[in-house]
Structure formats: C-alpha cells, structure tokens
C-alpha cells in the first residue's frame, strides 16, 4: 500500500460543528510529515502534472507551500505563493477566497500576462480557493497549464468545476461514519 493511502486511512478524525474532518500532515501540518511521504507525493505530482512550458508554480498559502517548494526544487520551476497578506507591491492582484469554511482576501504577486502556470494545492474540497485563484490568474492573463491537488474530498461538485476547470488529484477520499474512505486511490486525471 502506498504511503499516501496508508496515511489517510490512519488519519485521526475530529468533529467540528457537526462535520467530520481528517487531520493529515499534508492538509494540516500535523501529525508530523515524514519525508518519505512528501517524496512520494512530489514524485506523483511530477508524473501527473503537465509541466511542459510551465514558467511558475502558483500555490495558495499556507498548506500548499511545503508541497510546492519540494516540486519547485525537483523541477527548477520558480514558486509563487498567493498570500493572505497584502504587501502593496506593483502588480499585486487581490482575489476573494470563499470556501465552505471561511471568506477572506488573498493576494497574487509576481504573476504576469502570458505566464504559463501550474497551480498546486494540498486539498480540493469546496473548490472556493482554487475558483478564486483561477479567476484572478485569468484576469491577469496567465495561462493555467494544469491544476493538481494532492487530496480531493469527493463530496460532489465544487466551485472549481463550476468555474470550468478540472483539477488532477493524487487520491480521492470521503469521510464516512467517522472514517476516511478511499473513493479513488489514483485520483483524477
């Protein structure tokens, strides 16, 4: 059994406001992230993602950063982190992040018209973050070459689908009766 699948099946489940969440090192930073798990994930991303002509990897803060940093190191593709903090730099673009859990502003720097980007994130759940990010990247004039998320919470449609984008995923899961259930161990292509 691969490490990602095994780690998800062993993930602790917590209940918050009547909703069951799995707690995982990729999506939450706890429990401890083992290097062999991160390595496996990065190799799978590199094999699955469309990397031809990609100029930049774009990831929303915060939990996509460790994954995207490792992919950047392995591919020599520069990394842009979309931050929740405004810096006021020239060319900074704001976007609304509306998820099933919260609403906030995020800020894109260092992405320009004509850039070929790979969007990476840890989890695709409601799709709100990635729908907002893809809209901002479109407004900038960047070309979204591919979108890859490590884990998809397969609970139906999401805002990214509604925005007209498909994300590739490494594994698709649901939390059923207080346990993580693997829906598709190979994810979406």
From Swiss-Prot:
The keyword Magnesium does not apply. GO terms for molecular function: transferase activity. It comes from the Archaea. SUPFAM superfamilies: PRTase-like (SSF53271). PROSITE patterns: PUR_PYR_PR_TRANSFER. One of its GO terms (biological process) is purine ribonucleoside salvage. It is an enzyme of class 2 (transferase). Its EC number is 2.4.2.-. Transmembrane segments: none annotated. InterPro entries: HGPRTase-like, PRibTrfase_dom, PRTase-like, Pur/Pyrimidine_PRTase. The keyword Transferase applies. Pfam families: Pribosyltran. Keywords: Purine salvage, Transferase. May catalyze a purine salvage reaction, the substrate is unknown. Belongs to the purine/pyrimidine phosphoribosyltransferase family. Archaeal HPRT subfamily. This is HGPRTase-like protein 2. It comes from Haloarcula marismortui (strain ATCC 43049 / DSM 3752 / JCM 8966 / VKM B-1809).
């Amino acid at each position: 059994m691969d490490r990602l699948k095994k780690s998800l099946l062993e993930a602790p489940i917590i209940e918050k406001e009547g909703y069951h969440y799995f707690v995982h090192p990729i999506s939450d930073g706890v429990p401890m992230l083992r290097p062999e798990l991160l390595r496996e994930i990065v190799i799978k991303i590199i094999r699955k993602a469309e990397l031809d002509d990609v100029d930049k990897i774009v990831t929303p803060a915060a939990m996509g950063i460790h994954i995207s940093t490792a992919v950047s190191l392995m591919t020599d593709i520069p990394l842009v982190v979309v931050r929740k903090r405004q810096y006021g730099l020239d060319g900074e673009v704001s976007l609304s992040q509306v998820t099933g859990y919260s609403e906030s502003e995020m800020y894109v720097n260092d992405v320009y018209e004509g850039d070929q980007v790979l969007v990476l994130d840890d989890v695709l759940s409601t799709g709100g973050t990635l729908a907002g990010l893809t809209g901002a990247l479109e407004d900038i004039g960047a070309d979204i070459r591919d979108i890859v998320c490590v884990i998809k919470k397969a609970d139906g449609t999401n805002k990214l689908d509604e925005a007209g984008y498909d994300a590739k995923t490494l594994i698709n899961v649901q939390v059923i009766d207080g346990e993580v259930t693997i829906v598709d161990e190979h994810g979406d292509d």
